[in-house]
């Protein structure tokens, strides 16, 4: 499978469809739609939104960055359709997000995932993210696991 990665607007239709698919998958895994502490990402607070497209133009994955402070950002809405998993597209999206973070002068990326996402946990650990204490809105959440990587 070949793909390209493009920066898109947060309200891009393909991106919205991918985020809806991610929400549906997470709702199923967690048994409800109440699995994300804090405010959901929005066009007002997302600095970078990337979409991975197959050679025929089908949007297969996405990921975003939300600035936390002058030196760090949070990875949000990382998602790859089931058909694209294991193809390397998630790693390519994450590397592209890391490159975008470096270009903005951010030296640290953080993220939140959860215990019902063992595949995501394995992926982030394989990509060099290490577990950290819960931060921000995730403090006290029994559904959150947080990770960080210094770029």
Spell out what each predicted region is.
Residues 94, 101-112:
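Conserved GNAT acetyl-CoA-binding A-motif
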Residues 81-83, 87, 115:
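Active-site acidic-Proline motif in GNAT/NAT acetyltransferases
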Residues 3, 7-11, 107-110, 114-151:
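C-terminal "cap" of GNAT-fold acetyltransferases
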Residues 3-76, 81-83, 94-96, 100, ...:
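Acetyl-CoA-dependent GNAT
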Residues 71, 87, 103-107:
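Short coil/turn segments at alpha/beta junctions that flank glycine-rich nucleotide-binding fingerprints
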């Amino acid at each position: 499978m070949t793909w390209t990665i493009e920066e898109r607007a947060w309200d891009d239709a393909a991106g919205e469809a991918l985020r809806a698919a991610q929400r549906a998958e997470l709702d199923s895994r967690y048994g409800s739609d109440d699995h994300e502490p804090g405010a959901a990402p929005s066009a007002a607070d997302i600095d970078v939104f990337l979409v991975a497209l197959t050679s025929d133009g089908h949007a297969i994955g996405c990921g975003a960055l939300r600035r936390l402070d002058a030196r760090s950002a949070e990875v949000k809405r990382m998602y790859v359709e089931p058909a694209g998993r294991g193809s390397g597209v998630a790693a390519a999206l994450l590397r592209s997000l890391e490159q975008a973070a470096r270009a903005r002068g951010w030296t640290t990326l953080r993220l939140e995932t959860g215990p019902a996402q063992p595949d995501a946990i394995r992926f982030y650990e394989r990509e060099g993210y290490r577990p950290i204490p819960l931060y921000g809105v995730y403090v006290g959440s029994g559904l959150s696991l947080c990770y960080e990587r210094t770029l």
